[in-house]
């Protein structure tokens, strides 16, 4: 959690880092999703450059232990992961709606900055339409809530009267 928190980027930082990665490593496309629960890099033509990219990111964040916390998902598995993220099937609370909005905001920022390239743009567009189908054709979002809402509901089950509880 400590490392994940230190990796959080605001939208401006995401795009700046995206430009740096695309230029430095001659990538065919870059998108960086950074939320309170995840920082993910969607990169095109990066498979033979991953060690150098991770090394650059360790320097960027001044985190020499970053490599130990990074995992990569490539090719079709990476596409499936993006679709799961967009559909909120890979969220702390299954079906929560925030991640799709965050992903759309990221898409807009990176598209406006001309960083997505010819592969990521249609891939993200398809992920959004798939997410819409998941939400409308399944029950995955029927009880979707935020993490904070879920925490309050759990607290209600644990304590008889929340008004008598102190939260720090």
Where are these regions (language model features)?
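A glycine-rich (often HGG/GG-containing) alpha/beta subdomain
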Residues: 1-91
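Conserved class I S-adenosyl-L-methionine
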Residues: 165-168
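Glycine/serine-rich phosphate-binding loop and adjoining beta1-alpha1 elements at the start
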Residues: 65-163
């Amino acid at each position: 959690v400590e490392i994940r928190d230190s990796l959080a980027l605001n939208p401006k930082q995401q795009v700046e880092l995206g430009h740096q990665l695309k230029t430095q490593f001659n990538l065919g496309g870059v998108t960086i999703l950074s939320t309170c629960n995840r920082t993910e890099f969607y990169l095109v033509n990066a498979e033979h450059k991953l060690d150098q990219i991770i090394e650059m990111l360790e320097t960027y964040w001044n985190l020499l232990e970053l490599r130990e916390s990074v995992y990569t998902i490539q090719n079709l598995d990476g596409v499936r992961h993006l679709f799961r993220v967009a559909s909120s099937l890979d969220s702390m609370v299954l079906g929560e709606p925030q991640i799709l909005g965050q992903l759309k905001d990221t898409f807009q920022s990176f598209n406006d900055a001309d960083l997505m390239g010819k592969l990521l743009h249609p891939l993200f567009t398809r992920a959004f339409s798939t997410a819409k189908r998941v939400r409308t054709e399944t029950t995955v979002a029927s009880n979707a809530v935020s993490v904070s809402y879920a925490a309050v509901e759990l607290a209600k089950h644990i304590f008889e009267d929340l008004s008598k509880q102190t939260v720090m």
